[in-house]
């Protein structure tokens, strides 16, 4: 049986270069299909997250600490879609890197930085939602614009510092010089990382993920208790006070927001867990994972950057309304920034 993944004749990324990497060609039909699938993910990540950023920045009604966190998260996913996914697509399908060693390091650095930035944003968003649900009336005084700004700064600075250390200082290759030398060929962009730094990378994924799981477990427990309390209060007295009515509306709104962002967090964990586990296994068991499994795990993770706008569009009526206004060009009209996006 003829395989799509190999041919009898050996092919090189650069035919006239002795140190060229070996090319593993796909059949023309499969290549077209993969370009369509991967390209669609990149376009969706770019366009979808750009709509989120424009919505939050343009409409004044969306100018809140929590929404600025969401816009910053969308910016990270947008950068994954525009600066990482297109080049990874070519590398995955052509099995060669045609963009040079310098850009290989930059691409790898951006890849790690933007993806960890997404994780850090989600962790801070879970903290925001926890405060909003457990203390809805004092939440505006606790999670202010300045606090949101600090969270956003940390979510960008730490991943950039970590990624720069891994890909530009050479410390991540200590002890695996022979492997680095073996992987060094023209047309390749495979960055080898030693076990210590792989473990650090795993902890950078595991610790924020654990924090999010704990916080969202508490959020849904508190939300359930609030729902029961509000229902009991309403059924016990026909004349509900304005304060109790306000509490009920606030609690309901924050529970819905927590549910939506809980789905976002779950989607991130499901998308990134296979890749993280695969990387950990490879580092400690001698790179036993087949290349195609690694590629599949990597692209499942990449596709997460395209999922968040779809989640917002499904759960948030205000986002659907904002999309209509943006795509119709109505945001170019005067005073469009003051348009009401909420039904209530």
From Swiss-Prot:
Source taxon at top rank: Eukaryota
Residues modified by glycosylation: 4, 18
Membrane topology, as annotated: Multi-pass membrane protein
Electron transport among keywords: no
GO biological process, one term: G protein-coupled receptor signaling pathway
Keywords of the record: Cell membrane, Disulfide bond, G-protein coupled receptor, Glycoprotein, Membrane, Receptor, Transducer, Transmembrane, Transmembrane helix
GO cellular component: plasma membrane
Topological domains, Extracellular: 1-33, 89-102, 168-196, 278-295
Membrane topology, Cytoplasmic segments: 55-67, 128-146, 218-256, 320-344
Disulfides per UniProt: 21-185, 104-189
Transmembrane segments: 34-54, 68-88, 103-127, 147-167, 197-217, 257-277, 296-319
InterPro entries recorded: GPCR_Rhodpsn, GPCR_Rhodpsn_7TM, TAAR, TAAR_fam
Molecular function terms, GO-annotated: trace-amine receptor activity
Localization in the cell: Cell membrane
Family: Belongs to the G-protein coupled receptor 1 family.
Function: Olfactory receptor activated by trace amines. Trace amine compounds are enriched in animal body fluids and act on trace amine-associated receptors (TAARs) to elicit both intraspecific and interspecific innate behaviors. Ligand-binding causes a conformation change that triggers signaling via G(s)-class of G alpha proteins (GNAL or GNAS).
Protein name: Trace amine-associated receptor 8b
UniProt source species: Rattus norvegicus
Lineage of origin: Eukaryota, Metazoa, Chordata, Craniata, Vertebrata
Gene that encodes the chain: Taar8b
């Amino acid at each position: 049986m003829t395989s799509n993944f190999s041919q009898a004749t050996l092919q090189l990324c650069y035919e006239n270069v002795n140190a060229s990497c070996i090319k593993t060609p796909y059949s023309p039909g499969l290549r077209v299909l993969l370009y369509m699938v991967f390209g669609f993910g990149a376009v969706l990540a770019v366009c979808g997250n750009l709509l989120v950023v424009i919505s939050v920045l343009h409409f004044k009604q969306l100018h809140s600490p929590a929404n600025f966190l969401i816009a910053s998260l969308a910016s990270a996913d947008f950068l994954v879609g525009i600066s990482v996914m297109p080049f990874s697509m070519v590398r995955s399908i052509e099995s060669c890197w045609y963009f040079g060693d310098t850009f290989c390091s930059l691409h790898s650095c951006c890849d790690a930085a933007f993806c960890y930035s997404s994780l850090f944003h989600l962790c801070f968003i879970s903290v925001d939602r926890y405060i909003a649900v457990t203390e809805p009336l004092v939440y505006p005084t606790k999670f202010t614009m300045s606090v949101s700004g600090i969270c956003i700064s940390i979510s960008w600075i730490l991943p950039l510092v970590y990624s720069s250390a891994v890909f530009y200082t050479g410390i991540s290759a200590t002890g695996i010089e022979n492997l680095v030398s073996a992987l060094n060929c023209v047309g390749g962009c495979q960055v080898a990382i030693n076990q210590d730094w792989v473990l650090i990378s795993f902890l950078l994924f595991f610790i924020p993920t654990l924090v999010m799981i704990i916080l969202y477990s508490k959020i849904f427990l508190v939300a359930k208790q609030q729902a029961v309390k509000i229902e009991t209060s309403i059924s016990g007295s026909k004349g509900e006070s304005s304060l109790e009515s306000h509490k009920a509306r606030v609690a309901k709104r924050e529970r819905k927001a927590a549910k939506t962002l809980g789905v976002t967090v779950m989607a991130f964990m499901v998308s990134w867990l296979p890749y993280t586990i695969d990387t950990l296994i490879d580092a400690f068991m001698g790179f036993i994972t087949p290349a195609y499994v690694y590629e599949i795990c990597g692209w499942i993770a990449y596709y997460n950057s395209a999922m968040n706008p779809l989640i917002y569009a499904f759960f948030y009526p205000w986002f659907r309304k904002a999309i209509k206004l943006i795509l119709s060009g109505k945001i170019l009209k005067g005073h469009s920034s003051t348009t009401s996006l909420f039904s209530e």
